[in-house]
Design a protein with these regions (language model features):
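A charge-rich, low-complexity, intrinsically flexible signal that marks solvent-exposed coils, linkers
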Residues: 88, 97-110
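Active-site-proximal binding-pocket segments
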Residues: 1-56
Length: 112
């Protein structure tokens, strides 16, 4: 659990984590990682609100062959595909939610 959970600061370093994950891929460092290390190293792609990063996430987690992680990546991807962002972050980041996002947030499993 993050010490900044439910606070805007929780997302302050996301860009750095994503940069490091991209470097890990670019340099091929992940090839020496075990599955748990790969799961962790690839998470910034899953947590990114950039659609292209979501596609990378799906490919990475699909190649890992762990159903639970792939299903989580797919869930994140589908939310970004539909809304272009994670609606559960709106309140924390002081973003205005659309009516569609508000309806979505009332459904079970809409938040992480």
């Amino acid at each position: 659990m993050s010490i900044f959970r439910n606070k805007p600061e929780a997302f302050n370093s996301d860009h750095l984590a994503l940069f490091l994950s991209k470097e890990i891929l670019r340099l091929g460092l992940y090839q020496k990682f075990n599955k748990n290390e790969k799961i962790f190293a690839f998470m910034p792609f899953m947590h990114s609100e950039i659609f292209e990063d979501q596609i990378i996430s799906l490919n990475l987690y699909s190649n890992l062959g762990i159903k639970e992680n792939f299903h989580s990546a797919l869930k994140h991807f589908n939310i970004i595909r539909k809304f272009g962002r994670f609606p559960h972050r709106n309140k924390i980041l002081n973003r205005k939610s659309t009516d569609e996002e508000l309806a979505f947030l009332k459904t079970p499993g809409s938040s992480f």
